[in-house]
């Protein structure tokens, strides 16, 4: 009797272990890395991801500061302090508005920087063409 119980439990553990091992291996070999995900994105989405990376990092740092402050306080966990409750509509709307403003400011700054670079490039090309024309033309020659 006892051997059949051990045999059954052995089968159960073997079946469970094989299911778990299969899941782990499938997860490991079918989940793309971050680099592969970025490579698969369209150029517009990849550019947007790169633009918003700093914003996400700043948001994460702010969250970590709030977590550190909450951890140091003696208040219960449900008293979130500076973190807005997800059930408060006015707080989350203000946060969303602030996030959208920051995002718009960042996009505007990047667009201005891109325009400045294009203008500098055009200015340099114009100067090069002007120098080339001046060097070819002899202004003091009569013929």
Swiss-Prot record:
Key word Mitochondrion present: yes
Keyword Transmembrane helix: yes
Subcellular location field: Mitochondrion inner membrane
Primary localization: mitochondrion
Cleaved signal peptide residues: none
Matching InterPro entries: Cbp4
Pfam families reported for this sequence: CBP4
UniProt keywords, alphabetically: Chaperone, Coiled coil, Membrane, Mitochondrion, Mitochondrion inner membrane, Transmembrane, Transmembrane helix
Coiled coil spans: 99-131
Membrane topology type: Single-pass membrane protein
GO BP annotations listed: mitochondrial respiratory chain complex III assembly
PANTHER family xrefs: ASSEMBLY FACTOR CBP4
Family: Belongs to the CBP4 family.
Protein name, entry field: Assembly factor CBP4
Source organism phylogeny: Eukaryota, Fungi, Dikarya, Ascomycota, Saccharomycotina
Annotated gene: CBP4
């Amino acid at each position: 009797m006892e051997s059949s119980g051990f045999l059954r439990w052995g089968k159960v553990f073997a079946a469970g272990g094989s299911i778990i091992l299969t899941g782990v291996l499938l997860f490991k070999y079918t989940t793309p890395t971050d680099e592969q995900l970025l490579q698969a994105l369209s150029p517009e989405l990849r550019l947007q991801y790169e633009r918003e990376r700093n914003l996400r990092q700043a948001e994460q740092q702010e969250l970590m500061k709030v977590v550190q402050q909450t951890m140091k306080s003696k208040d219960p966990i449900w008293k979130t302090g500076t973190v807005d409750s997800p059930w408060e509509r006015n707080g989350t709307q203000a946060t969303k508005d602030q996030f959208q403003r920051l995002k718009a400011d960042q996009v505007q700054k990047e667009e201005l920087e891109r325009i400045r670079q294009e203008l500098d490039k055009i200015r340099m090309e114009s100067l090069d063409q002007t120098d080339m024309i001046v060097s070819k033309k002899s202004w003091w020659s009569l013929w």
